[in-house]
Amino acid sequence: MEQTVHVPLGARAYDVVIGPDLVAQAGQRIAPLLRRKTVAVLTDETVAALHLEALRAGLAADGIEMEALALPPGEATKGWPQFTRAVEWLLDKKVERGDIVIAFGGGVIGDLAGFAAAVLRRGVRFVQIPTSLLAQVDSSVGGKTGINAPQGKNLIGAFHQPSLVLADTAVLGTLTERDFLAGYGEVVKYGLLGDAAFFDWLEENAPAMAAGDMALRVEAVARSVQMKADIVARDETEQGDRALLNLGHTFCHALEAATGYSDRLLHGEGVAIGCALAFELSARLGLCSQEDPSRVRAHLKAMGMKTDLSDIPGDLPPAQELLDLMAQDKKVVDGQLRFILARGIGAAFVTADVPSEKVLEVLQEALAHTQPA
């Protein structure tokens, strides 16, 4: 059932191994990378309570000792205070340049631990063991690491590729339904941006996958990772094609900022809503048929996901304010907002040529549905 996706980046190439029970095999998988039989693990309190002893046992099976620091769970951890704490802890533990740091958690831990590894002693190697669906299909692959600033998400960071990624699909069984579906937002994104056949496959198989079918989970993660690996190999530092991976993210980042990066909206939920809005905008601009956004929404709804602004609890700011938040996005070039739009399902492209009044129209219409009648 296990699948391996190779990320071909020359001297920085690595494998992403996908399958059940990889945490139990962590020792034998990581041992070839080690110069001495000890590792430092960064995790969060939720993951630690559920899985840290299993990781300790998996490492001990190969005679590897581990020390672990568990940070508070949640997006708020991804800032200077906890980052400083993590780096100083790694220094206290005398992590050397030849050692390995393990990122054991979801996207927040992966981003923070990867960035800590990137700056520690000017760069130590790290291994990703992503525990959420979102991290397995997205943030653990591709080497983007970083933390948030008061001015916006992911504005402080570095490109630092992992040495190995172990995506244990059995661990996904401990996710809440909400977290699993939030991660699924990123899975759908891959079908929407470049693989119509994968989107067809998801329409047919995703309900059974969400219900727990392990072979389908491995397949969905592997296909997502393969697609990301192909794009990252073509464009590691996001000069061109890699921007396609941001489908739905320009809307998403504005919505996350508007909701204060809180639990009102999880990142993957924002991506799903953002993808629906990006297709809506594409149809509005005459790039794709109106059937495409309808099909996107129908699938997200069938999966029980957030699809509209009205699905976000609480009040949202007016359309112009959301548009202003979009301008804070990292994808701004020469003051122009870059959007990822679509000529159809599986046919996304990057453009800066989007009239802001059209974006405003789509936002105003989406917000109109949130007002109580």
Swiss-Prot record:
<comment type="function">
    <text>Catalyzes the conversion of 3-deoxy-D-arabino-heptulosonate 7-phosphate (DAHP) to dehydroquinate (DHQ).</text>
</comment>
<keyword id="KW-0479">Metal-binding</keyword>
<dbReference type="GO" id="GO:0009423">
    <property type="term" value="P:chorismate biosynthetic process"/>
</dbReference>
<feature type="binding site">
    <location>
        <begin position="131"/>
        <end position="132"/>
    </location>
    <ligand>
        <name>NAD(+)</name>
    </ligand>
</feature>
<dbReference type="InterPro" id="IPR056179">
    <property type="entry name" value="DHQS_C"/>
</dbReference>
<keyword id="KW-0547">Nucleotide-binding</keyword>
<dbReference type="Pfam" id="PF24621">
    <property type="entry name" value="DHQS_C"/>
</dbReference>
<feature type="binding site">
    <location>
        <position position="153"/>
    </location>
    <ligand>
        <name>NAD(+)</name>
    </ligand>
</feature>
<keyword id="KW-0456">Lyase</keyword>
<dbReference type="GO" id="GO:0003856">
    <property type="term" value="F:3-dehydroquinate synthase activity"/>
</dbReference>
<dbReference type="InterPro" id="IPR050071">
    <property type="entry name" value="Dehydroquinate_synthase"/>
</dbReference>
<feature type="binding site">
    <location>
        <position position="144"/>
    </location>
    <ligand>
        <name>NAD(+)</name>
    </ligand>
</feature>
<feature type="binding site">
    <location>
        <begin position="107"/>
        <end position="111"/>
    </location>
    <ligand>
        <name>NAD(+)</name>
    </ligand>
</feature>
<keyword id="KW-0963">Cytoplasm</keyword>
<dbReference type="GO" id="GO:0005737">
    <property type="term" value="C:cytoplasm"/>
</dbReference>
<dbReference type="Pfam" id="PF01761">
    <property type="entry name" value="DHQ_synthase"/>
</dbReference>
<comment type="similarity">
    <text>Belongs to the sugar phosphate cyclases superfamily. Dehydroquinate synthase family.</text>
</comment>
<dbReference type="GO" id="GO:0009073">
    <property type="term" value="P:aromatic amino acid family biosynthetic process"/>
</dbReference>
<feature type="binding site">
    <location>
        <position position="249"/>
    </location>
    <ligand>
        <name>Zn(2+)</name>
    </ligand>
</feature>
<keyword id="KW-0028">Amino-acid biosynthesis</keyword>
<dbReference type="InterPro" id="IPR016037">
    <property type="entry name" value="DHQ_synth_AroB"/>
</dbReference>
<dbReference type="InterPro" id="IPR030960">
    <property type="entry name" value="DHQS/DOIS_N"/>
</dbReference>
<feature type="binding site">
    <location>
        <position position="186"/>
    </location>
    <ligand>
        <name>Zn(2+)</name>
    </ligand>
</feature>
<keyword id="KW-0170">Cobalt</keyword>
<comment type="pathway">
    <text>Metabolic intermediate biosynthesis; chorismate biosynthesis; chorismate from D-erythrose 4-phosphate and phosphoenolpyruvate: step 2/7.</text>
</comment>
<protein>
    <recommendedName>
        <fullName>3-dehydroquinate synthase</fullName>
        <ecNumber>4.2.3.4</ecNumber>
    </recommendedName>
</protein>
<keyword id="KW-0520">NAD</keyword>
<dbReference type="GO" id="GO:0046872">
    <property type="term" value="F:metal ion binding"/>
</dbReference>
<dbReference type="InterPro" id="IPR030963">
    <property type="entry name" value="DHQ_synth_fam"/>
</dbReference>
<keyword id="KW-0862">Zinc</keyword>
<dbReference type="GO" id="GO:0008652">
    <property type="term" value="P:amino acid biosynthetic process"/>
</dbReference>
<keyword id="KW-0057">Aromatic amino acid biosynthesis</keyword>
<dbReference type="GO" id="GO:0000166">
    <property type="term" value="F:nucleotide binding"/>
</dbReference>
<feature type="binding site">
    <location>
        <position position="267"/>
    </location>
    <ligand>
        <name>Zn(2+)</name>
    </ligand>
</feature>
